[in-house]
C-alpha cells in the first residue's frame, strides 16, 4: 500500500515538473522544479 502511494506521488511530481519547466534550461530538482530544462524530468535532471 505504501509503495503504491509513493509511486503516485512520484508520478505527480514528474508531471508537475514537466509542465513547469517546459522550454527552460538547467537542472530539475525535487525541491525546485522551476529550475529545469524541457523534456523528461527525473529526480536528478532532465533529458
Curated annotation (Swiss-Prot):
Cellular component terms per the entry's GO annotation: extracellular region
Location(s), subcellular: Secreted
Superkingdom of source: Eukaryota
Keywords per UniProt: Disulfide bond, Neurotoxin, Secreted, Signal, Toxin
PTM comment: May contain 3 disulfide bonds.
Molecular functions (GO terms): toxin activity
Signal sequence, renumbered to the chain: 1-19
Tissues and organs where the protein is expressed, per its UniProt entry: Expressed by the venom duct.
Keyword Disulfide bond in record: yes
Main location, first listed in the record: secreted
Record's function text: Probable neurotoxin.
Similarity remark: Belongs to the conotoxin O1 superfamily.
Comment field on protein domains: The cysteine framework is C-C-C-CC-C-C.
Name recorded for this polypeptide: Conotoxin Cal6.18
Lineage: Eukaryota, Metazoa, Spiralia, Lophotrochozoa, Mollusca
